[in-house]
């Protein structure tokens, strides 16, 4: 099937695949996502029993009717048909005031609601990676990365920028298939486009330096920076650039990738916010140093993705042809991957939040009801040379601070029935804070040793930007071509090692 070709979307047209069916045809089972757009629910079609995802379009802040971002998303997904892009099935409406999965009325001041119906996917990459004890294998990482790049290459060939690549927007089913989702920030583009685009896109940790420096003219390279961050995150077992704000994000980028200058990045000094955010001192590129535990071919590919100058950043098509995907161990067949219990970022965050609340409640309970102190203590035994009193934590099992240790009287506390002798200087630990456990910094890029490649410990949980249900679309099948040239599938094809897509048989 030939790929669709399209340019700017006509936002005056009514959204496509607008059905006449009501949301009452579905039974909401569980909320699996939430964001600025609304909520995402796992639901079951009552008539067929098919499990789907319902993405509710938030209308309460829209004074002018249907949100333009939703129109863009629907139109783009209607045009995209690929096995690595989420499929939008239909649009349904609710005739009256809508209710959530618990039967409570929502806050929509308008009557009715609008839902996008998507194929259901069991996981998103963030939720899956956050599962305790889960370790991705190297063939598994290669499999996911190959599918991500294939889907993104298809989008770029069809002149669509995703503009929000992150783990929670990469959906995975229990057959190992990965699909790009949440096209709420996506838009079409053309190489001869002269207008300005917003730079307030892409979640901060995955945002490229050109957007952070104020660029308003950009192309597919912005998505490839995000892919590089995802790639390193899979291998490093945690996010690599977790900035708290734009300034800190740029600092982390420059500390890793070096200072930008006119030699390495022509035109950078003319970018709108360069003078505000340029490093105070020259910084050298340290990607190879920070990620020296990576496989050689993985590091070579990552170096080409995390390039400051977008004009020199590798494309999705060229990345698919990298040696990384054509050397052992090869990407595995998606169907060979293990199945897991449903894991979405929204659910894992909710579980962590509940766990924190339980821990805080336990602490409050302990403060309100402290352990009872001993009301009767045996008399102190003194004798021999006196020593400085050690520092003991207060509590029922230790003497009070700044006083000699209290020893109960009685034969059971005598050594072989003889009176206890004078306390020696080494009987108790010295006063002061005792060292124990680890006091390691978890920041930066050198927080410990890592396995040679693949996942070590599970992701370190942390804020990942807005948590959003990532559903976004199109049926599989396409032939690549277009601006990159060629009519076959991307990459080296199936003539190498007689393996289609480079998968092990």
UniProtKB/Swiss-Prot annotation:
InterPro entries: CDK (IPR050108), Kinase-like_dom_sf (IPR011009), Prot_kinase_dom (IPR000719), Protein_kinase_ATP_BS (IPR017441), Ser/Thr_kinase_AS (IPR008271)
Gene3D superfamilies: Phosphorylase Kinase, domain 1, Transferase(Phosphotransferase) domain 1
Phosphotyrosine modifications at: 37
Tissue occurrence: Highly expressed in flowers. Expressed in seedlings, roots, rosettes and stems.
Phosphothreonine found at: 198
Residues annotated as signal peptide: none
EC number: 2.7.11.22, 2.7.11.23
Domain Protein kinase: 26-325
Residues that hold ATP according to the record: 32-40, 55
Biased composition, class Gly residues, residue ranges: 482-491
Keywords: ATP-binding, Kinase, Nucleotide-binding, Phosphoprotein, Serine/threonine-protein kinase, Transferase
Reaction catalysis annotation: L-seryl-[protein] + ATP = O-phospho-L-seryl-[protein] + ADP + H(+); L-threonyl-[protein] + ATP = O-phospho-L-threonyl-[protein] + ADP + H(+); [DNA-directed RNA polymerase] + ATP = phospho-[DNA-directed RNA polymerase] + ADP + H(+)
Residues annotated as catalytic: 164 (proton acceptor)
Subunit structure: Interacts with CYCT1-3.
This protein's encoding gene: CDKC-1
Family recorded in the similarity comment: Belongs to the protein kinase superfamily. CMGC Ser/Thr protein kinase family. CDC2/CDKX subfamily.
Lineage: superkingdom: Eukaryota
Region Disordered: start-end pairs: 336-505
GO annotation terms (biological process): response to virus
Bias (Low complexity) ranges: 429-456, 492-505
Protein name: Cyclin-dependent kinase C-1
GO molecular function, one term: ATP binding
Source organism of the structure: Arabidopsis thaliana
């Amino acid at each position: 099937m030939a790929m669709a070709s399209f340019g700017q979307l006509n936002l005056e047209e009514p959204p496509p695949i607008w059905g006449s069916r009501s949301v009452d045809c579905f039974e909401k089972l569980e909320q699996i996502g939430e964001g600025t757009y609304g909520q995402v629910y796992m639901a079951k079609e009552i008539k067929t029993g098919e499990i789907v995802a319902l993405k509710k379009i938030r209308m309460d802040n829209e004074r002018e009717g249907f949100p333009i971002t939703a129109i863009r998303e629907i139109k783009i997904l209607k045009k995209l048909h690929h096995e690595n892009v989420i499929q939008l099935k239909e649009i349904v409406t609710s005739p009256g005031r809508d209710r959530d999965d618990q039967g409570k009325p929502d806050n929509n001041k308008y009557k009715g609601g609008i839902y996008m119906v998507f194929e259901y996917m069991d996981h998103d990459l963030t939720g899956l990676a956050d599962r305790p004890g889960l370790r991705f294998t190297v063939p598994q990482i290669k499999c996911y990365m190959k599918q991500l790049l294939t889907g993104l290459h298809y989008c770029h060939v069809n002149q669509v920028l995703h503009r929000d690549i992150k783990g929670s927007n990469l959906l995975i089913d229990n057959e190992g298939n990965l699909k790009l989702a949440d096209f709420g920030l996506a838009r079409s583009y053309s190489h001869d486009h002269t207008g300005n685009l917003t730079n307030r896109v892409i979640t901060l940790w995955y945002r490229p330096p050109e957007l952070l420096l104020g660029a308003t003219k950009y192309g597919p390279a912005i998505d490839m920076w995000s892919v590089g961050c995802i790639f390193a995150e899979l291998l490093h077992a945690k996010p690599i650039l977790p900035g708290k704000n734009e300034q800190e994000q740029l600092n982390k980028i420059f500390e890793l990738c070096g200072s930008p200058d006119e030699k390495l990045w022509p035109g950078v000094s003319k970018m709108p916010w360069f003078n505000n955010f340029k490093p105070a001192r020259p910084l050298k590129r340290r990607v190879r140093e920070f990620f020296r535990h990576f496989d050689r071919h993985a590091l070579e590919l990552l170096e080409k993705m995390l390039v400051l100058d977008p004009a020199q950043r590798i494309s999705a098509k060229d990345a698919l042809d990298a040696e990384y995907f054509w050397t052992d161990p090869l990407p595995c067949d998606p169907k060979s991957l293990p199945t897991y219990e449903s894991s979405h970022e929204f659910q894992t965050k909710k579980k962590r939040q509940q766990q924190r609340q339980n821990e805080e409640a336990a602490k409050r309970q302990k403060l309100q009801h402290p352990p009872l102190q001993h009301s009767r203590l045996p008399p102190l035994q003194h004798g021999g040379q006196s020593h400085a009193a050690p520092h003991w934590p207060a509590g029922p099992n230790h003497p009070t601070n700044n006083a000699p240790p209290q020893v109960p009287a009685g034969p059971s506390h005598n050594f072989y029935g003889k009176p206890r002798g004078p306390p020696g200087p080494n009987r108790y630990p010295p006063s002061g804070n005792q060292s124990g456990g680890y006091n390691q910094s978890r920041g930066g890029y050198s927080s410990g040793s890592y396995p040679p490649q693949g996942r070590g410990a599970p992701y370190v949980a942390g804020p990942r930007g807005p948590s959003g249900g990532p559903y976004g679309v199109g049926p599989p099948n396409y032939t690549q071509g277009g601006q990159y040239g060629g009519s076959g599938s991307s990459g080296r094809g199936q003539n190498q090692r007689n393996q289609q897509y480079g998968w092990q048989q």
